[in-house]
């Protein structure tokens, strides 16, 4: 069986090399692997580094450098288009593979699931400081889910602890290539930062879809390096609302119960009080208004949200107080 590591990258030469090292250092597995890298016109010597790796290591590297920067969303998709494998393990170029992850994955592959979803370990930016040894996406142990009907999906959604359970985190996703290729992509998801989630949710909603949850941290997530924060902490919060409310409407507008179950996963990721306090600290007037509207769509009390937001100046003044700092740190990560 061939596993394709599908890695979108842009100017992350050093991090990418750490990822390749973590793959090369895997032991005790009996799988064929290939590395598929879509480089978004990097200028940091990534291409030269790849040439060195090709000469020094046994696994094949399929590398394509885009002539222009396509933007992150199109590059996510481009990395998968390079793959020849039975399964694609979609991987952020700043993350790393945990020890023995391929050997562990191999023990699950007999289920022939359409999707494998694994947990992650969270570290500092150096991949050394352990901040959370096991971040779980579901409140269950290992489980094989079969989605024959909407009740099956609703039960699954009720067990999600965050939007990681509905495919937000790239490096946790291992998907059958033929299932991915069968989806007719909706180009309106370009620019949402979550184009892959549209495809994964389309697979998830396919009758008979098999999802195998691996309650083990096979991935090391590099902290303090969220590319979604480039436009600020407040915008980072709104990205989740914009994409996941769109997903809720596009997939479940005709099933109120399932739509609510999906939206509740977003509320677990972005609990209203913590998130509103963070927005009060970091958001401008437009961003605060948008957050208030989003929570109203989720059934939250708009007056309560706006009351908390009005304390923005006070919240900003005391944001270094331990309690509030912990609140905002929980949301902005």
From Swiss-Prot:
Read off the InterPro entries from this record: Glyco_trans_2-like (IPR001173), Nucleotide-diphossugar_trans (IPR029044)
Supply the EC number(s). 2.4.1.60
Query: In its keyword annotation, does this UniProt entry include Transferase?
Result: yes
Q: In which pathway does it act?
A: Bacterial outer membrane biogenesis; LPS O-antigen biosynthesis
User: Which terms in the Gene Ontology molecular function aspect does this entry carry?
Assistant: abequosyltransferase activity; glycosyltransferase activity
A Pfam match is Glycos_transf_2
Q: Which UniProt keywords apply?
A: Glycosyltransferase, Lipopolysaccharide biosynthesis, Transferase
GO biological process, alphabetically ordered: O antigen biosynthetic process
Reaction(s) catalysed by this chain, per the record, are:
CDP-alpha-D-abequose + alpha-D-Man-(1->4)-alpha-L-Rha-(1->3)-alpha-D-Gal-di-trans,octa-cis-undecaprenyl diphosphate = alpha-D-Abe-(1->3)-alpha-D-Man-(1->4)-alpha-L-Rha-(1->3)-alpha-D-Gal-di-trans,octa-cis-undecaprenyl diphosphate + CDP + H(+)
User: What the protein does?
Assistant: Catalyzes the transfer of CDP-abequose on D-mannosyl-L-rhamnosyl-D-galactose-1-diphospholipid to yield D-abequosyl-D-mannosyl-rhamnosyl-D-galactose-1-diphospholipid.
Q: What does the similarity note say?
A: Belongs to the glycosyltransferase 2 family.
Q: Which PANTHER family match?
A: GLYCOSYLTRANSFERASE (PTHR22916), UDP-GLCNAC:BETAGAL BETA-1,3-N-ACETYLGLUCOSAMINYLTRANSFERASE-LIKE PROTEIN 1 (PTHR22916:SF3)
Q: What is this protein called?
A: Abequosyltransferase RfbV
Native organism is Salmonella typhimurium (strain LT2 / SGSC1412 / ATCC 700720)
